[in-house]
Amino acid sequence: MHLVLLAIGTRMPAWVTEGFNEYQKRMPPDMRLTLEEIPMPKRGKGDAGSQIRAEADALRKRLETIVKKSPGAKTVALEVNGRALDTHALSRKLGELKDVGQDLVLLVGGPDGLCPELSASAHERWSLSNLTLPHPLVRVLLAEQLYRGWTLLTGHPYHR
């Protein structure tokens, strides 16, 4: 199983890269986690809508390439209004996908969020929190929760 975090932004602070990499290296080969960064389009003055659409175009283009390599991949848009999952529910989702050999692509937008049309085209929409989270933090938080979900599936003592 392959977990792909497809995210807008390429210049993250060192703590974000270090945090993501720490959980990425803990994941087993049969549930590999990768990060695919999409460069943030140049920001115009005050037009968040066009920025979000440009980001969506870039995400969609890369997503099409991923889905060609893994036709059954499930896409999940991460957004504040998505379905809230607790750690056990996330772990069960991972287990279900792993059991059928389905890859998972998680979409993370830029500072202004995901384009509603891109979000609507995903198989599911999940929320990590009711709080508004900075998109760099989402990378670390999500990597940790994916690792924690795997530890629940395997009985690893990380989650107590």
UniProtKB/Swiss-Prot annotation:
It catalyses: pseudouridine(1915) in 23S rRNA + S-adenosyl-L-methionine = N(3)-methylpseudouridine(1915) in 23S rRNA + S-adenosyl-L-homocysteine + H(+). InterPro entries: Alpha/beta_knot_MTases (IPR029028), RlmH-like (IPR003742), tRNA_m1G_MTases_N (IPR029026). Its main location: cytoplasm. CDD domains: RlmH-like. The keyword Amino-acid biosynthesis does not apply. The keyword Methyltransferase applies. Coiled coil: none annotated. It is found in: Cytoplasm. It comes from the Bacteria. Keywords: Cytoplasm, Methyltransferase, rRNA processing, S-adenosyl-L-methionine, Transferase. Its EC number is 2.1.1.177. One of its GO terms (cellular component) is cytoplasm. S-adenosyl-L-methionine binds at residues 78, 109, 128-133. Pfam families: SPOUT_MTase (PF02590). Specifically methylates the pseudouridine at position 1915 (m3Psi1915) in 23S rRNA. Belongs to the RNA methyltransferase RlmH family. This is Ribosomal RNA large subunit methyltransferase H. It comes from Alcanivorax borkumensis (strain ATCC 700651 / DSM 11573 / NCIMB 13689 / SK2). The gene is rlmH.
